[in-house]
Amino acid sequence: MALSKIAALSTILASASLVAGHGYVSSIVANGQNYTGYLADSYPYMSNPPKSVGWATTATDLGFEDGTEYADPNIICHRNGTNAQLSAPVQAGSKVEIQWTPWPDSHHGPVITYLASCNGDCSTVDKSTLEFFKIDAVGLIDDSSVPGTWGTDKLIEAGNRWTVTIPDSIAAGNYVMRHEIIALHSASQKDGAQNYPQCLNLQVTGGGEGVPQGTLGEKLYKDTDPGILVNIYTTLSNYVIPGPALYSG
């Protein structure tokens, strides 16, 4: 594709992102049981919304956080994220299925999942104290054609569903799962990357004795990270997934 056409396509998609729908985690399946997430397009309008395993947010526009908020609490569990009151039990070593609402196919980027121990009750933990370790990440899968195939494309192909395995080595206890899409369609400009962090409470049973070292949510990213400030409308020889290294325990 000619460079002029690539530039034009980038501009069109960046403009479209202002009006295109975005998404959020509507439910998860853990230990074979379905749990409703925080329904950001309906629960905020209820006087007494149902309790959920998903953290509440005020992102009723289904919008995003960007690089200007990487040192702000909003990047941790989305806009004004507030503790979920329920937790989903899950066996260490088992899989959790995460269901998103329909994700726009123009919003290419990585899908990343973290855990953080609450060291107690996740319904009351101070989110600014949570230290996240990365348990799953899929970025650029294939770049044989611009803009490439990404984790988001894999998610869409699976019916807007993502499956992640809880490490079998981590200690039993209460954890916040921070599951996130970073859309890169406008990321060639500083603060153009769009973060969609979603937090959910898990009660991990079984497991080992692992207590992975984590990173505070407000220190996960910098707006100049190579996986954040990147032009996906050029051929990429390599893509570095943002955030700390993947937990290998």
Curated annotation (Swiss-Prot):
Q: Where does O2 bind?
A: H185, Q194
Mind telling me how this protein is modified after translation? The catalytically essential N-terminal histidine His-22 is post-translationally modified by methylation to prevent protonation of the histidine side chain, and protect the critical active site of the enzyme from oxidative damage.
- Alphabetical list of InterPro entries matching this protein: AA9, AA9_LPMO
Its keywords, alphabetically, are:
Carbohydrate metabolism, Cellulose degradation, Copper, Disulfide bond, Glycoprotein, Metal-binding, Methylation, Monooxygenase, Oxidoreductase, Polysaccharide degradation, Secreted, Signal
> Where in the cell is the protein located?
Secreted
Determine if Metal-binding is one of this entry's keywords. yes
- Disulfide bond sites: C77-C199, C118-C122
**According to the UniProt entry, what is the EC number of this protein?**
1.14.99.56
- Predominant location of this chain? secreted
Q: What is known of its domains?
A: Has a modular structure: an endo-beta-1,4-glucanase catalytic module at the N-terminus, a linker rich in serines and threonines, and a C-terminal carbohydrate-binding module (CBM).
Family from the record: Belongs to the polysaccharide monooxygenase AA9 family.
Q: What is this protein called?
A: AA9 family lytic polysaccharide monooxygenase A
Q: Which gene encodes it?
A: LPMO9A
